[in-house]
């Protein structure tokens, strides 16, 4: 993360009056989440990066966002104000683009390796075409594309070039133009961690209990889970005890921002007793198979 870019993002959040939480763990290692912010229309999970993030960091960002129902955003200086970068179900935005998204303004131009495209609203396109009595063949001739391409447009399987977008606006008005943020909620990716890790075992336990759940590697929580309106975060006691206080503080910030239940998994009864006095919900590592039962009892 670049300190200067972080300052710019924080300035935007303050200027726009956005409620946000800055995540400051881990401090020196790779980090998948920098900020969680509540925009005008949706919650954003934000990573600030000028370097290309690793696949693991990106997977973390996507899976965390998928489970808590938020939009993952990578803030980068690799794009212009009004152009998003679309890759692997994560939207890349400039600082200015993030400000627009936070305000709920449309961002409809995006760039991939395949070129620059305009996001369209497939349902509006289909409705407008039907209302104006255009067949797919009629519209394909007007736009200079195939009938199959029209079918793809109307089923949300393809967006359009700038040239085609201009023709669609002339025909149907700018209502047909979409917003890249509207379809930015990702799907869970499979866990790539060894299945014998504590976090993977916890995630599997919660998945078996009917939660959407994923282990998370590069932030203050190690497992994120949700079922209906209920969200659960699990933080595992770190190996380095010098990091414990910081990790728990940052995990608590995330839990408060998401209004979720936080469970701390510890290795010893003495640590459990110590943290229980501080008001944390505690489970020992030997008892993690009963985690879902503990959560159900708290409902």
UniProtKB/Swiss-Prot annotation:
UniProt keyword list: DNA-binding, Transcription, Transcription regulation
Transmembrane segments: none
Domain spans labelled HTH cro/C1-type: 125-180
Keyword Translocase: no
Molecular functions per Gene Ontology: DNA binding; DNA-binding transcription factor activity
Pfam families linked: HTH_3
InterPro entries named in the record: Arc_TR_HTH, Cro/C1-type_HTH, Lambda_DNA-bd_dom_sf
DNA-binding region(s) in UniProt: 136-155
HAMAP family assigned: HTH_type_cro_C1
Protein name per its UniProtKB record: Putative HTH-type transcriptional regulatory protein Msed_1725
Origin species: Metallosphaera sedula (strain ATCC 51363 / DSM 5348 / JCM 9185 / NBRC 15509 / TH2)
Lineage, top ranks: Archaea, Thermoproteota, Thermoprotei, Sulfolobales, Sulfolobaceae
